[in-house]
């Protein structure tokens, strides 16, 4: 089976009918001639293994669950801003277990003023907090007892009910993310490409599984690294006509793979001296942060393609020759916990839209 872009089909149709007439019989004739005259320009659909297809479904489901969790948390934040600003001052991450346990006990400013430290301590312990509880309790208790402007009692009660309903949805979303992440990890660890992918600096299990899910394990799908880079959207697009040449970022791409590649840039900088030096060089040449990050991940995608084709693990000395090779850190961050749950990086990723 061969997949052909509908826009390409319309261009082929103009070769046989300049008047732009269209019929089912004519389209069948055009499609047949496409594969007869230009078979080398079109590829058949990839044949991925059953395990790779299952990872594809789990990785996309997990990413959707993460987006749902973020969306619900933002809705809850919007409601709390209207009647409970002291709670927002106490917690940056509303999806954290401490924030959800506290809001369950004190859904309104009135309940927050009445909240006692022993009750809050017990709630945090039930939520799974084991260390630093006294200091956390003191911080939360002090924040909730700060004076604030209040809504009328009936309005405040109604908003508290709204926040409680969103809290239940957020609890479900958090549980869904945790469950899907566990299942995704088990499936990804069984794949033979997992060790090669996670040998790259900054590629955790979740982020590596997302990349594997989008590129698959049919190695004939991308004969060269150039095709994979274009598929991920990290390779630039060059438009040349006469004396004019324009190089721009690629807009048509696999958006999920492009998003994973974007998230890969920051941990790669933290854990690869060669990548950090390469990124710094691009910035010194005048590239913006996003342009330098795309250039870095473009190189990383190319190295990943080579390692998967040759069944080799990542080697820093070969990946970035003539660059510093001393280890910067040994810790690999999680893609979601390190790059998706903080307010600062929500601002950084504000231009990435859900496909």
Describe each model-derived feature in a short phrase:
Residues 1-355:
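A detector of single, family-specific signature residues
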